Amino acid sequence: HVNGTLIHNNKIYESYHIRKEECEYFRIVVADINIKNLEFKDFYSSNECGPKYSAGRMQFFNHESQDGLLVSIGMGAYNKPSTFPQDKKTIISKIIFINLNTKKHIVYSLGHRNPQGLLVDGKNIISTEHGPHGGDEINKIIFQGNYGWPIASYGTAYDDVDKNEISSKGYLKSHSDSGFIEPVYAFVPSIGISQIIKIPNSFSKLWQNNYLLSSLNDQSLYRI
């Protein structure tokens, strides 16, 4: 299952996950762009057994003078509380940075649910993330930032979730009160948030430093 595609410096990167028995594994392959044939080679492989991977959006990024890829990795077991998002030892529910030379990764940010959109705009990193039953988020990503899932969310738990597994009152609404980073904006109800792109300033004098955000539920574009 292909998750994301990135073209950079005449190379094409594809992220995907494969299933073996009861596990799913996250992979990235890369190929030099050639109109006759694409010969993909392994770029990054995770040996972590995941419940179901999602997202997989990639962006080129320079972190501490090292070139690499930022990669958003979500999990598919959305309706059940999980320790993965707050566990720094796993890549699940994280945005990771993969060094282009060493192919080693670090956890760049944590506490994500399903970060479907990822954009690097200069020094700013912007992510869009599906919330539960509402609470879709636009986040400004900072290094080692914690975005709260599954403890804090402006969404509500699905009916098939035992709310007592989360807390007696469901998800915490305020992120900052618990030491997490607040979203730049949260959509309640959900819009089925997807990728975000920057509109070139040359497009319109009225739309300077604006972004376009796509919505799956509404089949609409939002200008921000």
Give the location of each predicted region.
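Aromatic- and glycine-enriched pocket-lining scaffold segments that form the walls
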Residues: 55-74, 93
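Residue-level recognition of a conserved intra-blade site in WD40 beta-propeller repeats
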Residues: 7, 60-63, 120, 198
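Asp-box/WD-like beta-propeller blade repeats and closely related beta-sheet repeat scaffolds
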Residues: 22-62
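Blade-loop segments of beta-propeller domains
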Residues: 1-9
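Short, solvent-exposed loop/turn segments that connect beta-strands within catalytic domains
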Residues: 6-7, 22, 36-37, 63-67, ...
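Short beta-strand elements that form the blades of beta-propeller/WD-repeat-like
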Residues: 11-16, 212-213
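Beta-strand C-termini and the immediately following turn/loop, strongest in propeller blades
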Residues: 16-18, 129
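Beta-propeller domain segments
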Residues: 2, 68, 75-224
